[in-house]
Amino acid sequence: MMQPGVFVEVNCQQKNRSGQRICGDVFLSRKVKEEGRVVVVLSDGMGHGVKANVLATLTATMALNFAREHKQAERIAEIIMNTLPVCSERKMSYSTFTVIDIETGGRVTILQYDNPRTLIFRGNKPLQVPWNCIVMNSEKNRGKEIHTCTFEPQKEDRMVICTDGITQSGMGSPSYPFGWGEEGLTGFIIDQISQNPVISARRLASRVVTMANKNDQYLLKDDASCAVVYFREPRRLLLVTGPPFEKEKDAVLAKMVDGFEGRKIICGGTTSDIIARELGREIKDSFEFPDPELPPVSSMEGVDLITEGILTLSKVVRILHDYNNNIVLGKGPADQIVRLLRESDEIHFVIGTRINEAHQDPNLPVELEIRRTVVKRIARLLEEKFLKEVSLSFI
């Protein structure tokens, strides 16, 4: 059984085939909060471009939903293969998939069809687990093979899943005449983990895709996707916004911030003034305006970031909503908050419930009227889109 206090970090990086605007690989991940499960799916549609993307999207969506419903591996594969539309040119339907189901008790189940084998690492060493082969017997899919395995993960374990655009990269080149292959990919990952034992899922996945692109002389011959699942110590963050409803609770809020183990963000001038006063610390204001839409940040001993309140948090909502792997975050206050949120796993929001009369102006957007609404939108995005552990408390 997996140790308590282990966070499951999931990230996928992708690069399109050279000259293609749409990726034919699709990655989906969902947290089944009520069951404490995380389900991850990577699918590679036949061909390239729009057709491949449609096949992969259909496959990944079905696989994700069926896995959430605890359907058997053979049944999942059977339904997917029978449902995919037939290609008008090749007269066949085809899409690969890898499904990883991480249960709350720690057991991991992997289901694969025609994707490169999922690589599992314990620290910087490959972990060998027994795989089962299921041969399908239905008339339409007779002879097709599905591979499954289960294992109990430990802290610092990693799983690396990819499409064949990674393992076949470099094919025909002097360095890799038969492609990079599982052996080359495994050696590369061992080197990366050895150099940086706490390398994040995002960074490792990004480096794998970058190397595959390099293998193909920066002209990828196929869509390349790599997803990494990393079991590690959670990174904690506290975000406080708004003064307490009762002034008598000011000291309680300040003590909460001072005693928190992890990164700390304060959003709101009144809130930061209260905490600085209660802790006897000085706030230093910056006069740089990297984002013309927002007031500049401030700093205080023991706090990682201090920003203005509602306007900044509203922009955080917009950035998180539109965020994807191609977005480059700037240096503005909202961008800095998003960066800290992305780098954290367990995020605790403390929302003060005293009404700030400045935000009751009817000319302001409705979303600015109640900070609780804005914070709840941030929390929902963090949970659903970024698989973060989020808690809210009101004071």
Please describe what each predicted stretch is:
Residues G36-H48, Q112-Y113, F151-S175, V229, ...:
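Conserved beta-strand-loop-short alpha-helix elements that form
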Residues I100, G105-I110, N115-I120, L127-R158, ...:
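His/Asp/Glu-rich metal-coordinating catalytic cores
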Residues M1-C23:
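Regulatory cytosolic signal-relay segments
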Residues R107, G259-K264:
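Short active-site oxyanion
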Residues T167-K255, G259-E261, R281-I395:
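C-terminal catalytic subdomain
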Residues V26-M81, V160, M171-G187:
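Primarily the active-site beta-strand->alpha-helix module of PP2C/PPM metal-dependent phosphatases
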Residues Q20-E35, W131-G172:
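Acidic loop->beta-strand submotif enriched in PP2C/PPM serine/threonine phosphatases
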Residues L55-N124, I146, I199-V229:
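Catalytic core of PPM/PP2C metal-dependent serine/threonine phosphatase domains
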